[in-house]
Amino acid sequence: MKVAIVGASGAVGQEFLRLLDERNFPMDELVLFGSERSAGTKYTFRGKELTVKLLQHNDDFKDIDIAFTSAGAGTSKEFAETITKYGCVMIDNSSAFRMDDDVPLVVPECNAEDALNRPRGIIANPNCTTIMMVVVLQPLENISHIKRIRVSSYQSASGAGAAAMAELQQQYKELVETGEVKTVKKFPHQLAYNVIPQIDVFQPNGYTKEEMKMYNETRKIMHTDAKCSATCVRVSSLRSHSESVWIETEQPISVEQAQQAIAAAPGCTLVDDPTTLTYPMPMDTAGKDDIFVGRVRKDLSDENGLTFWLSGDQIRKGAALNAVQIGEYLIKNR
């Protein structure tokens, strides 16, 4: 088994390196690819020094079985044929192919079997906020069909990349030293001591691209007709996203039923005890694999409504871990 990482020097690429090692991913060889800027960079993996190769239109992928790609939608579109033409399976972390009818969009806890039907040799990894939500929705859907979803996300700076994290830290430093923020490049407004109710660009319907991803991707992954309305907000934490989720189901689900289903579901950890002020928070979920769920309660305005809070590391389960789990599923089912 020969595996590649495309975009090895990025935040998600680095997480791929850590996870492939941590999970003892079965492979004989790992090959790293990157842009001209990162080509030549060296990383250590399982005691061996690996050098990032320049991603080019050549036959480098001829003997590679699985490629984890995380170098942006433009790169994925440009190099998809080069990567897949000899049979390599491309597990893509970008938005390039997510809504293509002939590309499965997969979260293993929900629709792992979809990964086996890949006409173009490409499997798409969903958006981080979508992944985190559907992992929790699936066990509830198994009890009663979800008709409607409303979600507000609280997304950390790292969701916009490593440079965005650095900018947030720089903004705090500037506020302490001078009392004003001078560095605003990665966000539309100052993020320090602030929240920004915009992630990605606005669409003609008034929603942002990020919000429409949650609507479209949730329906595709879960094979559902559920309506989903999202508001995505950037907050001034560094890592891990959180979401406040409300659902309406065909039949009522009790709090106890929901808690039991979530606690038993793969990829979920229930953290829900108001008597001890115990609930998920970004500072406690960073670096962890599961999605943590709490504040489970009945909606006071709808007997078929349920609401809950979740938090999880969007770089792990929201990106690299989900892709690695897809790869593991393919190996088990080849």
Residue ranges and their predicted role:
Residues 1-191, 227, 291-292, 296-302, ...:
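N-terminal Rossmann-like NAD(P) cofactor-binding subdomain of oxidoreductases
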Residues 67, 157-334:
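Charged docking surfaces used in two-component/phosphorelay signaling
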